Amino acid sequence: MAGLRPPLPDATSDGFLAEALAEANAHRAKHHAPPLVLDPELVEYARSRAASRSEYPDTQAGHDGLREGTGENLFWGAGSKKRPLAAGKAVAEWYDEIKGYDFGNPENVADCGHFTQLVWKGSRRMGAGRVAGQGPVFFETYIIFVFEEPGNKLGRFAENVRPA
């Protein structure tokens, strides 16, 4: 699908990637999931996904066009400060969805899919990408994490999303 506006500039840095991996793995450790490994090919894919998502307002593009076999978490933030938001901000918002996850009824995940993908035990590799720049009103940041193996598979939540 063609975008509504040009993509925002890439803002993926080594520091951003280090923070993304550290933040993700800190939360995964709480849930007895093995640490993720940063995969260079997935980093490039996440960067391209962040750019393409930024061609649309906020998160309107959703997960359209996501390649098969890949999980994805999407974050959008905007504000008056002219600097990209940190990976930790995205991870904190995704992890906060734990409030909606019922470990006693693990198949009901309508409002907590970012959390469950983040801590999904079966995911072993990740990539992260960030774009940021001036939007129509505010300075905008899009952050994408991609995962392989993808999470959120029906019938597999209890084994892959463990209590802290």
Where are these regions (language model features)?
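Extracellular cell-wall/glycan-interacting regions and their flexible linkers
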Residues: 1-7
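Short, well-ordered surface patches within globular domains
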Residues: 8-71
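Conserved, non-catalytic sequence blocks in retroelement Pol enzymes and Pol-derived host proteins
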Residues: 11, 78-81, 135
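Non-transmembrane alpha-helical segments in soluble domains
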Residues: 25, 47-50, 75, 91-95, ...
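Short clusters of hydrophobic/aromatic residues that line enzyme substrate/ligand-binding pockets
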Residues: 36, 74, 118
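Generic short alpha-helical segment signal, independent of protein family or function
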Residues: 51-54, 79, 95, 99
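Peptidoglycan-targeting cell-wall enzymes and recognition modules
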Residues: 67-93
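Disulfide-stabilized extracellular recognition modules
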Residues: 83-164
